[in-house]
Amino acid sequence: MNFRAVLAMLVCKALRLVSRILHRGGTAMPGRIALKIYPELLSLLAKDVRTAAVTGTNGKTTSSRMTEQAFLEQGKSYFANRSGANLISGITTEFVINSSLSGKCRKEYAVIECDEAAARRVFSQLRPQVIVVTNLFRDQLDRYGEVTHTLENIREGIKGAPEAVLCLNADCSLTASLANDLPNRAVFFGIDKGAAPSRP
């Protein structure tokens, strides 16, 4: 850990503590400032943590909580961004508060909900082992644009995590299409019995 990385963590932890004392929430702001001090901080802290990332238009929080329950039942040591801060700044804060100043995470696993618009930037730094994509619909057009733009954001994000196993909704054709042009191993889930099979 170099000086700037340690400084970024110290500032983030201090701001998070002050925000909690003042009851201001303060999940995103500490991470935003930490990344200005050391832009590679998330990548540094996430490299030794086995991470499941969940993104998509609907169902991110529910799917994340279901993943957490599976970890609980298996007795796994994990943390999650339950606060709903699912952009890169909030995700960075969660990694900082779950790590020592040496950069060692106190948990073995992480369950991270990621805003679909942030996937392009987050996945390349997070390098998750599993990426769950729930579905893709037109949503908040003023913020996200057309759904094809959101699909491209997620696709570009996955390209930054080539080792990740994709868990895709086979009942959503746009989501399932991510398996067609990416080298990642893909498995599928869905209600329809004709859901796409796993692809090696």
Which positions does each model-derived feature cover?
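Walker A (P-loop) phosphate-binding motif
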Residues: 39-86, 155
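Acidic, Mg2+-coordinating active-site environments of NTP-dependent enzymes
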Residues: 49, 106, 137-200
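Hydrophobic/aromatic beta-strand patches that form the interior of the parallel beta-sheet core
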Residues: 52, 79, 130-132, 167, ...
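Short, basic phosphate-binding NTP loop
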Residues: 1-53, 73-74, 89-97, 198
